[in-house]
């Protein structure tokens, strides 16, 4: 499961690429059963889609899909941040600082998949601090639907440096109970991400069109 997941996140398996059980089983040196189970898990994460009579393929995302997801996510992030500003404990605030520093440390290592995971871990603490399990679940589901593109988003050094600053500013705003400032930082964070991912989607679409013309 993790091997296939990492291959999708790193872009080794491209959006729209068919995932053949037999070929993957041979490639990984396993039977078809664990491959089939991995497909189901990846489908739940939004990384794989099952097409009738065609089988599994790496999920693609359109600009409309992305905008729909982010429209809902921005609204729910605002709720989570408002609640976190009011309810966050000293222990959670401490973990948030540690997570922000861990992101900065991982940035220096250059592992983009690991960097995306540390970014997720940072935001997960904020969701937990909101003390609403259902809200946490929905936000995690929305985040997973665009997870693959986060690695593309993190490829630019300028973006990585910006995120380090945004994380630190967000921790300070939540610590101070400054809801408006925290929500502003979160919105800018997601809007920058949206623009970067749309650039990636357009490049992918252009590549598909060029391939059709060949």
Language-model segments: which ranges?
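Short linear motifs at protein or domain termini
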Residues: 1-82, 86, 124, 198-214
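C-terminal all-alpha effector/ligand-binding and dimerization domain
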Residues: 97-104, 109, 148-214
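A general structural signal for well-ordered alpha-helical segments in protein cores
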Residues: 1, 21, 66-69, 73, ...
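Hydrophobic residues in alpha-helical segments
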Residues: 8, 84, 107, 130, ...
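Hydrophobic, well-structured mid-protein blocks that either form specific transmembrane helices
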Residues: 79, 85-103
């Amino acid at each position: 499961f993790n091997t296939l997941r990492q291959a999708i996140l790193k872009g080794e398996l491209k959006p729209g690429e068919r995932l053949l059980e037999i070929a993957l089983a041979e490639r990984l040196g396993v039977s078809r059963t664990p491959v089939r189970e991995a497909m189901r898990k990846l489908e739940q994460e939004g990384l794989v889609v099952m097409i009738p009579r065609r089988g599994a393929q790496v999920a693609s995302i359109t600009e409309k899909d992305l905008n729909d997801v982010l429209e809902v996510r921005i609204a729910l992030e605002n709720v989570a941040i408002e609640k976190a500003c009011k309810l966050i404990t000293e222990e959670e605030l401490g973990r948030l600082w540690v997570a922000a520093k861990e992101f900065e440390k991982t940035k220096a290592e250059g592992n983009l998949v690991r960097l995306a995971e540390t970014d997720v871990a940072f935001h997960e603490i904020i969701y937990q601090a909101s003390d609403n399990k259902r809200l946490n679940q929905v936000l995690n589901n929305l985040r997973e639907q665009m997870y693959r593109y986060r690695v593309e988003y993190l490829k630019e050094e300028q973006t990585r440096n910006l995120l380090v600053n945004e994380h630190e500013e967000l921790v300070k705003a939540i610590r101070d109970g400054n809801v408006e400032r925290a929500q502003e930082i979160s919105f800018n964070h997601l809007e920058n991400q949206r623009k970067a991912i749309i650039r990636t989607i357009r490049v992918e679409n252009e590549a598909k069109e060029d391939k059709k013309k060949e």
